[in-house]
């Protein structure tokens, strides 16, 4: 006699979801891939609430602070990230004398110790996120924690230059 023909976990063989680009007769346009609802945030991302304006910059400068508590190992990672992404223009010590400045490829990169700039953690993070003047955004190259690591490293360089 034959044994009953059971399927173990049948939903693995017959998925409940639709293939992303398959035809779907539920919607009028017959597409399964839908545009996300307005206001949704992709998993793994966080909302950055400051706009790319002078007012947003000033607000970030006053209000924004690092949400992460950093440990000693983070300092080494921060230095590495700074060297790769920032040091070429801003220099190893943050004095605005990176290799591109020395070779006159980019001019006018200010020192972190310039008293007229009065940078804060919030303003530094905002500039890394959006860019400012001739500096482009690094939001695609650095994730949120890495941006904060670089921000803290910049603030350390600023304090070292101010001594």
Locations of the language-model features?
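Conserved beta-strand positions that form and line the central face of beta-propeller blades
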Residues: 11, 67, 111, 134-137
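Short, charged/polar micro-motifs that form catalytic or ligand-binding hotspots
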Residues: 2, 114, 137-140
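Gly/Gly-Pro-rich "capping" loops immediately C-terminal to redox-active cysteine motifs
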Residues: 9-15, 75, 79, 91, ...
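Periplasmic c-type cytochrome electron-transfer domains
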Residues: 1-70, 142-151
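The canonical Cys-X-X-Cys-His
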Residues: 78-93, 150-154
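Short basic alpha-helical hairpin corresponding to helix-turn-helix/winged-helix-like nucleic-acid-binding
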Residues: 51-80, 93-96, 105-107
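C-terminal capping alpha-helices of c-type cytochrome domains
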Residues: 122-134, 139-163
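Glycine-centered loop/turn positions within well-structured domains
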Residues: 84, 96, 133
């Amino acid at each position: 006699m034959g044994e009953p023909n059971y399927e173990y976990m049948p939903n693995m063989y017959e998925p409940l979801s639709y293939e992303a680009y398959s035809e779907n007769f539920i919607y009028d346009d017959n597409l399964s891939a839908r545009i996300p609802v307005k206001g949704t945030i992709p998993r793994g991302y966080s909302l950055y609430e400051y706009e790319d304006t002078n007012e947003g910059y000033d607000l970030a400068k006053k209000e924004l602070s690092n949400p992460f508590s950093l440990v000693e190992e983070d300092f080494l990672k921060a230095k590495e990230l700074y060297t790769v992404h920032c040091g070429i223009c801003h220099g190893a010590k943050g004095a605005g004398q990176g290799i591109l400045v020395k070779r006159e490829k980019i001019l006018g990169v200010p020192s972190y110790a310039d008293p007229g700039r009065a940078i804060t953690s919030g303003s530094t993070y905002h500039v890394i996120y959006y860019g400012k003047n001739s500096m482009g955004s690094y939001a695609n190259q650095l994730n949120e924690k890495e941006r904060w690591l670089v921000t803290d490293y910049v603030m350390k360089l600023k304090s070292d230059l101010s001594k």
